Structure formats: structure tokens, C-alpha cells
Amino acid sequence: MKVLVKQLMSKSLFTINLDTTLDVALKSLNANSIHRLPVVDNDGNLKGIITDRDLRLATDSPFLPENNEDRLEKLRLHKVSSIMKQNPVTIEDFSPVVEAAKLMRVTNVGGLPVLDKKGRLIGMVTRSDLLDLLIKVLEPVPPQS
């Protein structure tokens, strides 16, 4: 069974701009129940990725106040470009899903931005997507009566 990334990826894509502040990024992650956000420039080109873990590390800094409201205020002062991972690992839409799984395993990331042949960001494929496919493939089909 050969499944391509484009068949599995999520096309409902939430992105943020380089100039987005960290508090807005955190709110976007929480509001959309996602763990990573591709960071794009004004032309929609992928420039980086920011994860909920990146934001947790930024807010757990000993240099930030203990009070949550004060922490959020500090996050308002910084842009995602200051902590995003630049040049994230990506995969092309016509790649086999098994390649995405191997790439995630080797690079220890939970999701990959998906690019088309022209290098445009068109989706995301995540560990959850891979697990959903695995369940679908391995789950026994109930006998038909």
C-alpha cells in the first residue's frame, strides 16, 4: 500500500507571520488545538516553524516573572522570529508517507511542513496523521453479514 504525503496531510493550514508576537502565537496554538505553526514571510514563503515546546521554553525562562499575566506581557515584546526554528525539515507532497515517517523519526520532530514542487507551503503532516493511518491499516474489518 503506497500512500503519498499529499493524501494524508492536513490542508487546513494555520500559519503566522515573522512579525507575530509570541503571545499571539501561543493563543493561536491553543485556539486551534495544534502543536506547531509554520512561520511565513509576507509572500507566504516558509521561513521557520515554532512549536508549543519552543513557547514553553521561552515562558519558563528564569528571567521572566512568575505571574502568568506578567509572563504574557513579556511575550508581547518578542516576535516569533526571535525563537523560531529556521529552515525547518520539510517534505514534498508526492513523497511516500513512509519517507515522512522516517524523516520525523530521524530528526525527532512531530510534524513536517509539506511543500509542492515549486517549494510553496501547502500543508502539514504530523505524527498523529501517521498514527491515524496505522490504525486504519491495522484495524480489523468487521465481517459483513
Curated annotation (Swiss-Prot):
Where does the CBS domain start and stop, copy by copy?
Answer: 9-66, 84-141
Q: Which domain of life, per UniProt?
A: Eukaryota
What are the entry keywords? Answer: CBS domain, Repeat
Annotated SUPFAM superfamilies: CBS-domain pair
* Family matches, as InterPro entries: CBS_dom, CBS_dom_sf, Diverse_CBS-Domain
Recorded hits in PROSITE patterns, A to Z, give: CBS (PS51371)
Q: What is this protein called?
A: CBS domain-containing protein DDB_G0289609
